[in-house]
Swiss-Prot record:
Molecular function GO labels: phosphatidylglycerol-prolipoprotein diacylglyceryl transferase activity
GO cellular component, one term: plasma membrane
Lineage, uppermost ranks: Bacteria, Pseudomonadati, Pseudomonadota, Gammaproteobacteria, Lysobacterales
Subcellular location: Cell inner membrane
Tree of life domain: Bacteria
Major subcellular site: membrane
Job of this protein: Catalyzes the transfer of the diacylglyceryl group from phosphatidylglycerol to the sulfhydryl group of the N-terminal cysteine of a prolipoprotein, the first step in the formation of mature lipoproteins.
Gene this protein is translated from: lgt
Protein name per the record: Phosphatidylglycerol--prolipoprotein diacylglyceryl transferase
């Protein structure tokens, strides 16, 4: 049944402060990363690092996600707007985050943290890779709740009518509701591409990576698998997702910025998986009893 999107993006209010679902999804993402990371630390998946060290790594990662995601969005998707008004970079409440920018931010953050702790960069990235997909899934759910980043038109029974889409933006909620009840808006249903990405980049990637990480793997393998899966899934979903308005299609009337940015990920993923075939396997080293107590 075609669904009319009518979810309030505001979860609740505390006096004058309005708490948005998207912000809560970020909290859920960081909590899931902490919980999964704690489990991996207790199983010795990053030898020599205790919970204090992991908490430090998570803080670095959070900064990388937020700063990289925002800067990446400005550079990849709103560069002209940014050049005209550089201060818009700080208006995070207006929305605008890029996964690929966030990924670059996390890479820089993990490199700095690995250098600080004298660890191999890819040992750190292999540790982090299984912690990320659930956060991606929560982020896409936040996009859906916010009614943004919708897909192309579809007549599939699970299509969603988004009131903030251009074709309905000038109508009042009561008008939209009346037309929906009469079945007059069915032709305006769109692919819920946010949910497709939540399922693929969130659930599927988490199950695959977490299962794969249960046994010690060669260096580069987990990082390579993450990059490959994300690149492929994002490239596919872009075919049913409306391209970002300021940019549109970049070539062939179908190639999007998201697809162009995903191609290097696919190539890097394949290269890392090839490198892993000759790389050493990082054997787990269980933390000391004191470290286990500190994690409780």
């Amino acid at each position: 049944m075609i669904y009319l999107h009518a979810i309030d993006p505001i979860a609740f209010s505390l006096g004058p402060v309005k708490v948005h679902w998207y912000g809560l999804m970020y909290l859920a993402a960081f909590f899931s990363a902490w919980s999964l990371g704690r489990s991996r630390i207790l199983r010795g998946r990053l030898p020599g690092v205790d919970m204090d060290g992991f908490s430090d790594l998570l803080f670095y990662g959070m900064l990388g996600v937020v700063l990289g995601g925002r800067i990446g969005y400005m550079l990849f998707y709103a560069f002209e707007t940014f050049v005209a008004n550089p201060l818009i970079l700080f208006k995070v409440w207006e929305g605008g985050m890029s996964f690929h920018g966030g990924l670059l931010g996390v890479l820089v953050a993990c490199w700095l943290w690995a250098r600080k702790h004298r660890l191999h960069f890819f040992d750190v990235m292999d540790f982090v890779a299984p912690l990320v997909p659930l956060g991606l899934g929560f982020g896409r759910l936040g996009n859906f709740v916010g009614g943004e980043l919708w897909g192309k038109f579809t007549q599939a029974g699970w299509g969603v009518i988004f009131p903030h889409a251009p074709e309905l933006a000038d109508q009042l909620p009561a008008q939209i509701q009346a037309q929906y009840a009469a079945g007059a808006l069915n032709q305006l249903a769109r692919h819920p591409s946010q949910l497709y990405e939540a399922a693929l980049e969130g659930v599927v990637m988490f199950v695959v990576l977490w299962t794969f990480s249960m046994k010690p793997r060669a260096r580069y393998a987990l990082s390579g698998l993450f990059a490959l899966l994300y690149g492929v899934f994002r490239f596919i979903v872009e075919f049913v997702r409306v391209p970002d308005a300021p940019i549109g299609y970049l070539a062939f009337n179908w190639l999007t910025m998201g697809q162009i940015l995903s191609l290097p990920l696919i190539a890097v993923g394949l290269a890392l998986l090839a490198m892993s075939r000759r790389a050493p396997v990082l054997q787990p080293v269980l933390p000391t009893p004191a470290g286990v107590e500190a994690a409780k």
